[in-house]
Curated annotation (Swiss-Prot):
Task performed by this protein: Inhibitor of viral RNA replication which confers resistance to some tobamoviruses including tomato mosaic virus (ToMV) (e.g. isolate L), tobacco mosaic virus (TMV), tobacco mild green mosaic virus (TMGMV) and pepper mild mottle virus (PMMoV), but not to resistance-breaking isolates of ToMV (e.g. LT1, SL-1 and ToMV1-2) and tomato brown rugose fruit virus (ToBRFV). Prevents tobamoviruses RNA replication by affecting the association of tobamoviruses replication proteins (large and small subunits) with host membrane-associated proteins (e.g.
Record-linked Pfam families: PEP_hydrolase, UPF0261, UPF0261_C
Matching CDD domains: Tm-1-like
Origin species: Solanum lycopersicum
Region entry N-terminal inhibitory domain NC, spans: 211-431
Family: Belongs to the UPF0261 family.
Gene Ontology process terms (BP): defense response to virus; modulation by host of viral RNA genome replication
Self-association and partners: Homodimer.
Protein name per its UniProtKB record: ToMV resistance protein Tm-1(GCR237)
N-terminal inhibitory domain NN: annotated segments: 1-201
Disruption phenotype: Increased sensitivity to tobamoviruses (ToMV,TMV).
Gene Ontology molecular function, alphabetical: ATP binding; catalytic activity; protein homodimerization activity
Length: 754
């Protein structure tokens, strides 16, 4: 490949040569011309390599006189390899995803060789999706540019928290014309300037002896505090990076922490937690604070702007909040005062995180107000709510040598409080103000394939690693293709705004009419048999029958009557008398296209669950089963009961995570003890967030507990993000049968004999 030809700096011009060859060549020529022009005044000579990322059958082997990397060479960086890619060439969405992952690894290798000076590409919506994911994986500072037809729309999904630059193409990228010439030329020149500028700067200012860098979070209502903190930190010899706490801001800060760019944090404005808990538009996700604690860097935390939840224009505030105390910040931003009850939840979220810390943490709490609006005479002044937040944190946080809690008699924007924050930071931070700042390096193919070990929480996993790259070493081509087609259909539905609906079936007639109703997935497991025999679903978890044998028996009843819909098997992964690898092959040969972990120990809690984990019969065996099924190319749709389990399943390769809220509560034999519907929203969102941190493309469904009707499913789906549908079992076959038979008999009994 061209990356190995020279150790001199090199840029990649990347695109799909099968559809954008002329535009890619034109862009490459102007990048080279601009680099040569700028290089006349520079000691750097930068080479240009054209990289083809086409996903079609059409081959391109050269591009004018440029060094050229054909698509097959890029694809060789993916574990699927070129031959398997051919199977998916006609399935556009999956082909793009595979090529994007291959490009990510290709660029990682080039960056490891220390000669990658920048990347530039062009594309429509598909091309932008393909390129952006790979470009984002490169470290901050490496110039990365895409000329895109979607640069002027909603771009967060493309840019994330990276320094990727999108240039609007203005016209479609479809030939060279008077407009595209100007846009491509300007983008090429701008990119070349970025490349040469960075190379010259790196020569003059080495990054290996930089100042200790501190991340600081800010909102408009905490600006006086942050400005004072920043000014003092600079005097003390620190460099500061300030992040607007808008959801994206917190994620950007933690990404830089993970990358090694930030060595300490003053998390003054934690308002994103309020939006996450209550449902505002500037929310963090359930991983907030994790990167800081994992990297074990000094953390001083306060409660800035936890008196407010953010919404858009006043007309967009959800109906249930319309009677709350609202402050219109401007025409586009409305703020809602938080309540005593909500502040208790914020404290619980923060305390749960910080109590896990193994490094120095200091929490500073201002008694007289947490924002400019939380002061006497201001809209959000509420001493009861603010003092509740302080009391709860004092009560919940473990105050010890590792974690200090300081309650200070100031308002957050008082100069004395700002000084107290910095004093606390100096107490727990290293004495040196300079660091050997070496941001996280890119990974080789082997590194990436060995990433993401299953959580140590599950001892029965025995520390096994499961690749997140689509690694199917034990897959039959027909099984893998079936999985691919199913997932593509589901992704197509999601893109059209339609929910994914899965259903459990305990009888042939249930499965037959679930398919007739338009269901997307059907799962057979032993509880279906008990359920349709009038017993509770929990019977499937008790030693009343051989769970795996029941599923095989049900296959003969169900598979012949289901014509098109994917049918999966519920697998008891903790079965001590079955070799899982052989049993999965048996299920595959019978005709199942995928698996789910049921019966599951996730429905057990307390000492019994703990004993199962301790004696090697825990959730880890279910994770291991899903990983084995994934390697075989089977569709995997496991249940997860908490964020940690979702992470483990996502790392094992799960395609669809089903957020399980417990036994279904409705009907004559439903459970009576469960979380509330409102609590389910929070739990489902946390599981979805955890899943998407590991595998952004995973499908997430909600299931169980109080979610037992279309109305309740709609309630959850409308209040969550990244949740794509509902999976029902009792709600799909038991409840409809109970209601229909009861009503029908009642109608017959109401016949008049007179």
């Amino acid at each position: 490949m061209a990356t190995a030809q020279s150790n001199s700096p090199r840029v990649f011009c990347i695109g799909t040569a099968d559809t954008k060859f002329d535009e890619l060549r034109f862009l490459s020529e102007h990048v080279r011309s601009s680099l040569n022009s700028f290089s006349n005044k520079s000691s750097f000579k930068v080479g240009v390599t054209v990289v083809d990322v086409s996903t079609s059958w059409k081959e391109t082997n050269s591009c004018a006189d440029f060094d050229f990397v054909p698509s097959k060479d890029v694809l060789s960086c993916h574990t699927l390899g070129e031959e398997t890619m051919g199977t998916f060439a006609d399935i556009r969405g999956l082909a793009i995803a595979i090529m994007s992952k291959a490009l990510e690894t290709f660029l990682s290798i080039a960056n490891d060789e220390q000669n990658l000076a920048g990347v530039i590409g062009l594309g429509g919506s598909g091309g932008t999706s393909l390129l952006s994911s790979a470009f984002r994986s490169l470290p901050i500072g490496i110039p990365k540019v895409i000329i895109s037809t979607v640069a002027s729309g909603q771009t967060e999904s493309y840019i994330g928290t990276s320094d990727l630059v999108l240039f609007p193409s203005v016209v479609d990228i479809c030939g060279i014309n008077n407009v595209s010439k100007v846009v491509l030329s300007n983008a090429g020149a701008a990119f070349a300037g970025m490349v040469i500028g960075r190379l010259e700067s790196s020569k003059e200012h080495s990054i290996t002896n930089g100042k200790f860098t501190v991340g600081v979070t800010m909102f408009g209502v905490t600006t006086p505090c942050v400005n004072a903190v920043k000014e003092r930190l600079v005097k003390e010899g620190y460099e500061t990076l300030v992040f607007h706490a808008t959801g994206v801001g917190g994620r950007a800060m933690e990404d830089l922490v993970r990358g090694g760019f930030i060595q300490g944090v003053l998390d003054i404005t934690t308002t994103e937690v309020a939006d996450y808990v209550v449902g505002g538009v500037m929310a963090c996700d359930s991983s907030r604070f994790d990167a800081i604690l994992e990297k074990k860097i000094p953390l001083v935390l306060s409660v800035g702007a936890l008196d407010m939840v953010n919404f858009g224009p006043k007309t967009t505030i959800p109906p249930e909040f319309q009677q709350r105390k609202i402050h219109e910040h401007n025409e586009q931003v409305s703020l809602m005062r938080t309540t005593v009850g909500e502040n208790k939840k914020f404290a619980a979220f923060i305390a749960e995180k910080l109590n896990k810390a193994s490094s120095s943490v200091c929490v500073c709490l201002p008694e007289k107000g947490v924002s400019a609006l939380d002061a006497p005479g201001k809209d959000f002044y509420d001493p009861e709510a603010t003092s509740c937040l302080t009391r709860e944190l004092q009560m919940l946080l473990e105050n010890n040598e590792r974690c200090q809690v300081k309650v200070l008699p100031y308002h957050i924007n008082d100069a004395e409080f700002a000084n107290a924050l910095v004093d606390s930071f100096l107490e727990i931070s290293p004495k040196s103000r300079h660091v050997e700042c070496q941001p996280a390096e890119s990974k080789s193919i082997q590194d990436i394939q060995n990433d993401n070990a299953v959580l140590e929480k599950y001892p029965s996993c025995n520390g096994k690693n499961f690749s997140r790259l689509n690694d199917f070493p034990n897959a039959k081509p027909e099984t893998l293709q079936k999985r691919t087609v199913i997932l593509q259909k589901l992704k197509d539905q999601i893109s059209k705004g339609k929910p994914i609906i899965g259903a459990g079936a305990g009888t042939g007639i249930s499965a037959k009419f679930e398919e007739a109703g338009g269901v997307d997935l059907i799962v057979l497991y032993n509880s279906g048999r008990f359920r349709m025999a009038g017993r509770g679903s929990l019977a499937g978890l008790l030693p009343f029958a051989d769970a795996n044998a029941i599923v095989l028996e049900m296959a003969n009843e169900v598979l012949p009557v289901v014509k098109e819909v994917a049918v999966l098997a519920g697998v008891c992964a903790t079965d001590p008398f079955r070799r899982m690898d052989n049993f999965l092959k048996q299920l595959e040969s019978v005709g199942f296209c995928g698996v789910q972990n049921f019966p599951t120990v996730g429905l057990f809690d307390g000492n019994f669950r703990q004993n199962l984990e301790e004696t090697g019969m825990g959730y880890g065996l279910e994770v291991e089963m899903i990983a084995a099924a994934h390697r075989m190319g089977l569709l995997t749709t496991p249940y997860a009961f908490c964020p940690d389990e979702a992470v483990a399943m996502a790392e094992a390769g799960a395609d669809i995570i089903v957020a399980h809220m417990g036994l279904t509560t409705s009907g004559s034999i439903g459970a009576k003890t469960a979380v509330s519907l409102e609590e389910s929203v929070t739990c489902v969102q946390a599981i979805a967030d955890a899943t998407h941190r590991i595998y952004p493309d995973a499908i997430v469904l909600c299931h169980g507990g109080p979610i037992s009707s279309p109305e309740e499913a709609a309630y959850v789906l409308k209040r969550t993000t990244g949740v794509h549908g509902f999976y029902g079992a009792s709600s799909m076959e038991r409840l409809p049968v109970e209601q229909a038979i009861t009503a029908t008999v009642q109608q017959y009994k109401s016949i008049s004999m007179e």
